[in-house]
Swiss-Prot record:
NCBIfam families: alt_nitrog_alph
InterPro entries linked: Nase/OxRdtase_comp1, Nase_asu, Nase_comp1_asu, Nase_comp1_CS
Function: This iron-iron protein is part of the nitrogenase complex that catalyzes the key enzymatic reactions in nitrogen fixation. Other nitrogenase complexes utilize a molybdenum-iron protein or a vanadium-iron protein.
Top EC category: oxidoreductase
PROSITE patterns: NITROGENASE_1_1 (PS00699), NITROGENASE_1_2 (PS00090)
Keyword hit for Iron-sulfur: yes
Annotated organism of origin: Heliomicrobium gestii
Record's miscellaneous remark: The structure of the 8Fe-9S-C-homocitryl cluster is assumed to be analogous to the 7Fe-Mo-9S-C-homocitryl cluster.
Biological processes per GO annotation: nitrogen fixation
The organism's taxonomic lineage, starting at the top: Bacteria, Bacillati, Bacillota, Clostridia, Eubacteriales
GO molecular function annotations of the record: ATP binding; iron-sulfur cluster binding; metal ion binding; nitrogenase activity
Name of protein: Nitrogenase iron-iron protein alpha chain
């Protein structure tokens, strides 16, 4: 099913919400079809990552003779088809993993030939874990190993966060980003809903990791704490009281509780009449 394997947990849940990226699966076309268009993680670049998906479409002959040449051909063709997109994620599948295709080497070869592109390799074939949760872990760790720390961001606030484990399902992220902005907080990156590839390379410069979905993204938060000393703060942005509590926790961390409380009071006054209607 669409929620079945470690490959799915890496690509479908966490990888594909990144908006400015060509997402290509190295394997049979069925793997790609199974992880396309069943989640509504919209983006502000006309939903590029939802409209297009890519597969190397491995066949039986590639299992016998190898598919590295096929992969390189597909990578170059994809960049040529979308010249404005300079970032790519390649996802390993069971088929390409079992025959030992060296995806990392091919990715590096292309980056050497096309110096303006950058490629992330996610080695999380379907058999790599007992369920899709195994893929969550693998892509979390692969991202921090390969990409975090390779871009230096512009810091514009005294309060800087990564918003982690939020996938912008039908635009729900926009509500929280509005609250953060009103509190004077700079959101350095969103992992990974409506997230920008290069912004996510700069996660190491945040002051705090604000974590929404621990089940899918606590791994990168824990590693950011170990490697860069960035604290982790778990929140719940769904529900009136949980959201209020979450804003207070963030405000307390930065010493701006008054800003959080002002937003809570303003939004309570705005929505309380409608909530009271349901209680009648």
């Amino acid at each position: 099913s669409e929620r079945g394997c470690a490959y799915c947990g890496a690509k479908h849940v966490i990888g594909t919400p990144m908006k400015d990226v060509i997402h290509i699966s190295h394997g049979p076309v069925g793997c790609t079809y199974d992880t396309w268009q069943t989640k509504r993680y919209i983006s502000d670049n006309d939903n590029f990552q939802l409209k297009y998906t890519y597969a190397t479409d491995m066949k039986e002959k590639h299992i016998v003779f190898g598919a590295e040449k096929l992969l390189k051909k597909n990578i170059i063709e994809a960049f040529q088809a979308f010249p404005d997109i300079k970032r790519m994620t390649i996802y390993q599948t069971c088929a390409s993993a079992l025959i030992g295709d060296d995806i990392n080497a091919i990715a590096q070869e292309v980056m050497d030939e096309l110096p303006d592109v950058d490629i992330f390799v996610c080695n999380s074939p379907g058999f790599a874990g007992p369920s899709q949760s195994g893929g969550h872990h693998k892509i979390n760790i692969a991202w921090i190993d390969q990409k975090v720390g390779t871009v230096e961001p512009k810091i514009t606030s005294d309060y800087v966060i990564n918003y982690v484990g939020e996938y912008n399902i039908q635009g729900d992220q926009e509500v929280m980003l509005d609250y953060f902005k009103r509190m004077g907080i700079q959101v350095l990156s969103t992992f990974t809903g409506n997230g920008s590839y290069d912004d996510l390379r700069a996660m190491h410069r945040a002051h705090l990791n604000v974590l929404e979905c621990a089940r899918s993204a606590e791994y990168i938060c824990n590693e950011l704490r170990v490697r860069y000393g960035i604290p982790r703060l778990d929140i719940d942005g769904f529900g009136f009281e949980p959201l209020s509590t979450s804003l207070r926790k963030i405000g307390l961390f930065f010493g701006i509780e008054d800003r959080a409380q002002a937003i809570i009071e303003e939004e309570t006054a705005r929505w309380k009449p409608e909530l009271d209607w349901y209680k009648e």
